[in-house]
């Protein structure tokens, strides 16, 4: 019986954990996940394998168990010698039960708004929203105004309604200005010490010059948020309506001014005016909504859920809806929120706007190859600049480019919205807005849309896509 057992255990054809001559269905439950990964026969030492079986073993298995005990005491069996060499105690094979994970740390609710706290920030328990609001307010030296009695209730529902009272509440509960300043200085020092730019980020002089020109063109045609004197209006601020005519008049006026600034931006881009007038018009009409959306979305303030126009007018989400955005509103605000993690500066926004504009895949271009050649250095410039600015985040450049696809989708829906908007406004669509839309015939029944090549002869005499005549007035 012993010899038979040895043959069963040491047979060359026996797979790991399976004794020849016995069906595998008898004992597979004895192998835990850890045992299956053990060296061959490791679990046989000290009867550890059979200890895991129930007491009512089949007769053959009980006999094999006794034989195994005798075989392990034999020092002259080659097979058993191998078993003893590789065996370990059964105690070593039984994994100790893992210690339970520590309970999650629970913080007191946010001292400012009573929302769920994410930890202690600037001296007190606070949520991410109030932490970010306090940090930005201190770093940017923001000055807020309360339109009531300077005693507004601040909670997680009302915290965005009055910045003045929210900031005062931050101070009242103990948030520290100095903690913000020290944290900022510490981060600056760490960045200065740790970030060493590799030689590959050294730009050629011509690329540096291109970046400076594009950045200057953007900044001089689109003031940044911190440069604006923000003001608000109470017009239809709390409830969505189909259209607020007062807000629409203001919005259409500001949009017209923005379009003029985009044309000015385009004319200042290196190489743009070397294109044919027809191609300049095609590119501007195709990309104008893209750039308008990109620009307004960079002026999004998440704490107040507002957007600010170039004259400082600041509208909340409801007012933007009522001003004419309508069903497009939430899509635009969602895109603005997605831009925040990119932390794009003016130079990156300008370069991305230029790439949106000078794009060789637009329809009806006369010289698409020339347009593509103008776009190539802009792509390289944005790639180099983004990597030089964030050497530890090489993925930022492709993420920025992906936003162009999102912008085109929004612009398509924006053009559709303009068609329905025509039915809601009492008068005609402002001429420059109408001109910049890709399908102006939608606003005039039976009107034929001239192709850029057909219009170039009449507009080239003015020398400008905006149609400036010799007196300086603009004609749509």
From Swiss-Prot:
Motif Nuclear localization signal, residue range(s) on this chain: 184-189
GO cellular component: nucleus; transcription regulator complex
Protein name: Retinoic acid receptor gamma
Name of the gene this protein is made from: rarg
SUPFAM superfamilies referenced in this protein's UniProt entry, alphabetically: Glucocorticoid receptor-like (DNA-binding domain), Nuclear receptor ligand-binding domain
Cell division is among the record's keywords: no
Region: Hinge, residue numbers: 176-205
One of the Pfam families matching this protein, by short name: zf-C4
Zinc finger (NR C4-type): 110-130, 146-170
DNA-binding region as annotated in the record: 110-175
PANTHER family per record: NUCLEAR HORMONE RECEPTOR, RETINOIC ACID RECEPTOR GAMMA
Protein's organism: Xenopus laevis
Molecular-function annotations in GO: DNA-binding transcription factor activity, RNA polymerase II-specific; nuclear glucocorticoid receptor binding; nuclear receptor activity; RNA polymerase II cis-regulatory region sequence-specific DNA binding; zinc ion binding
Positions with biased composition (Polar residues): 462-476
Region (Modulating): 1-109
Span of domain NR LBD: 206-440
Record text about domains: Composed of three domains: a modulating N-terminal domain, a DNA-binding domain and a C-terminal ligand-binding domain.
Cellular compartment(s): Nucleus
